Amino acid sequence: MKYGFIKVAAASPALRVADCRYNAERAAEMMQQTAAAGAHLLVLPELGLTGYTCGDLLLQPTLQQGALTALQTLLSVSAELPLTTITGLPLSVEGKLYNCAAVLHQGQILGVVPKTNLPNYSEFYEARWFTPAPAGTRTISLLGQEVPFGTDLLFCCRELPEYKLAVEICEDLWVAAPPSTRHAIAGATVLANCSASDETIGKAEYRRSLVTGQSARLMAGYLYADAGRGESTTDMVFAGHNLIAENGKLLAQTALFTNEMAITELDVYRLAAERRRTTTWPTAEAAGYTVIPFSLPVSETSLTRFIDPHPFVPADSTERRERCEAILAMQAEGLRRRLEHIGCPTAVLGISGGLDSTLALLVAVRALDLLGRPRTDMVAVTMPGFGTTSRTRSNAEILCEKLGVTLRTVSIAAAVRQHFQDIGHDEKVTDVTYENAQARERTQVLMDIANQQNGIVVGTGDLSELALGWATYNGDHMSMYGVNGSIPKTLVRYLVRHAADTCDDEALAAVLYDILDTPVSPELLPAEEDGTIAQKTEDLVGPYELHDFFLYHFIRYGCPPRKILHLAELAFAGRYDRTAILKWLRTFFRRFFQQQFKRSCLPDGPKVGSVTLSPRGDWRMPSDASTALWLRELEDLQ
């Protein structure tokens, strides 16, 4: 439960129709198995103690009593387990029979939720046996306990206040206004569905979309426990399709036609953060709800869910290709609109032979293609300086030739040396003045050429550099339109690789692949004696894949340093140890706060993803905020 994670499961135990004792034994085994795996919530199928397909036997008192006896068995088992179990059974209340889900927790029946929507079409005949859930909540006597009975029950964990549980049953999800919507608005972050959904062609995909879609709309965790193979009888076949989703993402599911358990962890801190940042999410309104507290032991949850080390980059190759193409299209469309709006005949860009300027150039030629303008209207300027290597310069020249843009070469060496004389700086002192003078000279050259050409300067800096402040103020920090400003470095690599993989020109692909293999560097310090790059960015500020990971979890979900560290240790296990991660995490927070003043005056640029640092949109932070709280937390983690 530390860091907001709660391990949960949805399962389809083996079942025999109308054999309540057998069903209870199998469910009890599943409870033991679930608890042994460290889970604190188990959701079982609809009418799982009797079987959903009992038909008119459901009206038989013998079967109803058998269900109560089975419930007592599970209740006794629950007394010894740190586990909340939700199981389905028919229950007679005040002369009416209800299709119910009982919530069991350590020997207590916390509540009983009756089904609201009873399907009575096609193969379903529930209205033949059951009564829809009554309005309001009442108290019933059940197995010697006084138990809340109603749909509007909210089960709240004392030790983890963000963990609030509510229940609906099968068809309740499939209707126009599911009860789970009301439950989520009342504050529920985890929604459980006891279901008996028979299998027909195409239904599995539809069911999956319902579960993931509802979890996305409600910014919630959603557990769907489906009736398994034992329910298959007469005209219906059941597959036991168990699903667990979190905010639109499917975290776990079972294969069809198995009696398996889906098990994973939900991050209720993340869900709560998502609701807080979405200001259109209603204020929790639990009026009319019965709030039922329960307790769980506080312990660290062993995570089995995948922690993506590259959260900005889709892991699936097909999705990644589609994402890359969509991003390139968005970047190009943003620049196209800017050029069209100001009637600008030319775009000017500094081309270094590095990743960022390569991506910006690829975007710029797309924008010109969209405008129906010749690519020669794109003026790419290579500006060799004291640290420029033959490799990067050659790559820049070949790239421009293959893309058909106008290439200009302006050496900045003489101008910078004159500037050093003017300000009294010794050229042998390769300090920050030495470096930044070159960056600002390059920007001045670009701005002046843009004036000559009646054009605008296209910025190349990426999101990762902006987060770390790894840009010279009023140097590469500045442009008229920054196309890469919301693209993190890890994603820049994949975008350039996508361009290489999909282009028809072998020579162009070859130069793009070589650019991908070139170390990231601003090339502001003299090269090594053998002509290779001496100044390597990741040696100085740390691996970009780590910083992008930190950035994503800090900005997107507001994770504190200790949680980011925990997630990073899992995501990068075997690649970076705790000491290295802590070192660069400290660097990240220190630089992120110190360098906000640069982000407070960024040029325009297209928003591409959910994490961006534009001061006019997604990130509004004072330039002089203290980082003491965050660094102090990191000190405590040594």
Predicted features along the sequence, with ranges:
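Enzyme catalytic cores with a strong preference for nitrogen-chemistry domains
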Residues: 1-350, 366-375, 402, 407
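ATP/NTP-dependent adenylation/nucleotidyl-transfer catalytic domains that generate, transfer
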Residues: 6, 18, 23, 163, ...
